[in-house]
UniProtKB/Swiss-Prot annotation:
It holds the Pfam family GlutR_dimer. It is an enzyme of class 1 (oxidoreductase). The active site is at 59 (nucleophile). During catalysis, the active site Cys acts as a nucleophile attacking the alpha-carbonyl group of tRNA-bound glutamate with the formation of a thioester intermediate between enzyme and glutamate, and the concomitant release of tRNA(Glu). The thioester intermediate is finally reduced by direct hydride transfer from NADPH, to form the product GSA. Its EC number is 1.2.1.70. The gene is hemA. Keywords: NADP, Oxidoreductase, Porphyrin biosynthesis. The keyword Lipoprotein does not apply. This is Glutamyl-tRNA reductase.
């Protein structure tokens, strides 16, 4: 059921690992701030009925979260966004339509909460997605593509994710794409009887850092190839065994690419970093893990190189998270309750400023009449304080029942009719007692850290 028009109309479009192939997700992926800003600006320019917008782009999903103007048809916005994506990413509308999942209103809120709580992830319970959503929100907020509506939504999503983590055991086992990749590499080493536990890691972003930490926990020596030596120096300060990690500039890739049996690649590059022209034949078999989207490794021409992509790891992920069903069920209960609580909170935000406005109107009216009475000497000046207290108590008593009724009805869909009628009766339509000055109330946890 669609909520009445005084509430924000939330809307999501999602392309995920469940509905779209890796090859297609590569085309949608956005890996730079400049590209993301340009894409959001295109939406703002060509979709005037979208009030606020943000984009979440990860290796397993590309999602658009938006709030729509009142009386806007969601299907029209869906078609407009798919058209923008088709033109921007040089993809066919029919391919996009087959893979897209659209949600509106409560379903959209439930979807955002589920994604943020890692219930929709390839690795259920992984915590990386919450940080990715915070970064996506922060960017859209700072670039002024989102404001009150999405701030409220994301604030609640982060609270929901924290509650899921704290009240279930869904994140305790620490399974992630990076941990599954390293575990598979370890299995390969045992089967291949490779004794020299050395690995080459290309990249130093969040995914690469997680891989490195998992490798070190399994007693590997790691050579990192990257572009930023200062970032490497900061990173090794976090490590318990920094001596097992070394760094070389990625310009030296040719010197190392054929020397390691084990390679992990996870960068934000939109192009292949490891290319066939760099490869030479080796006497040993090689096992490469490409954890990037778009992929960083060109399909090898040599038969003794075995390449694993993110999607290739999915069966191993399912095997590792099979015993989380009970936690997952509990987590969905929390998300369902959070969705209800979110709408109750949103509806109460419409009522609270109205209650404040009514009380302020009563106070001003009482004070105005008291000053008239004092001026005309109907009452002595020395009684002013006592009369103010009497009037204050009187209008509090008068407004007590309406206040209770407003708060009670705030959780009902017809509350907008009641709110609108009261605003009209008391000429409060132009009141600004809440929204702008209280925007900080709706800011997400990111800004509270």
């Amino acid at each position: 059921m669609e909520l009445e028009t005084h509430l924000s109309k939330y809307f999501t479009l999602a392309f995920t690992h469940k509905s779209m192939s890796l090859e297609m997700r590569e085309k949608l992926a956005i890996n730079s701030s400049a590209t993301l800003k340009e894409f959001l600006q295109t939406i703002k320019t060509h979709c005037p009925n979208i009030k606020e917008c943000m984009v979440l782009s990860t290796c397993n999903r590309f999602e658009i979260y938006a709030s729509l103007k009142h009386n806007t048809h969601a299907n029209e916005q869906k078609n407009a966004l798919l058209k923008i994506l088709a033109q921007n990413k040089k993809m066919s509308m029919s391919d996009l339509e087959k893979c897209v999942l659209m949600n509106t209103d409560e379903s959209a809120v439930h979807h955002v909460f589920s994604v943020c709580s890692s219930l929709d992830s390839l690795v259920v319970g992984e915590t990386q997605i919450t940080g990715q959503m915070k970064n996506a929100y922060r960017f859209a907020f700072e670039e002024k593509f989102c404001s009150k509506d999405l701030t409220r939504l994301l604030h609640f999503a982060f609270k929901c994710a924290a509650k899921v983590r704290n009240l279930t055991g869904i994140s305790k086992q620490g399974v992630s794409i990076s941990s599954v990749a390293v575990k598979e590499a370890l299995n390969i080493f045992e089967k291949e009887r490779i004794k020299d536990k050395k690995a080459l890691v290309i990249g130093l972003g969040e995914m690469a850092q997680l891989v490195i930490k998992h490798l070190l926990n399994k007693q590997f020596e790691v050579l990192i190839l990257g572009r930023n030596a200062a970032k490497f120096e900061d990173f090794i300060k976090e490590l318990e065994e920094p001596k097992k990690v070394s760094f070389q500039n990625i310009e030296n890739l040719n010197a190392y690419i054929n020397a390691y049996a084990l390679l992990f690649c996870a960068t934000s590059s939109p192009h292949f970093i490891v290319q066939n022209r760099m490869l030479k034949e080796t006497s040993f078999r090689r096992f490469w893990f490409d954890l990037a989207v778009p992929r960083n490794i060109e399909k090898p021409v040599f038969n003794n190189i075995f390449l694993y992509s993110v999607d290739d790891l999915e069966p191993m992920v399912r095997e590792n998270v099979g015993n989380r069903q009970e936690s997952r069920t509990r987590a969905y209960e929390i998300v369902g309750l959070a969705t209800m609580e979110f709408y109750q909170w949103i509806q109460s935000l419409e009522v609270e400023p109205l209650i404040k406005d009514l009380r302020e109107l009563a106070r001003i009216s009482a004070q105005k009449e008291l000053q008239k009475a004092l001026k005309k000497r109907y009452v002595p000046k020395e009684y002013e304080g006592n009369i103010e207290k009497i009037l204050h108590n009187a209008f509090n008593t008068f407004l007590h029942h309406p206040t209770i009724a407003l708060k009670k009805n705030a959780q009902k869909e017809e509350s907008d009719v009641l709110v609108g009628a009261i605003k009209n009766l008391f000429n409060l339509d132009k009141s600004t007692t809440c929204h702008a000055q209280n925007l900080n109330l709706y800011k997400c946890e990111y800004y509270e850290e």
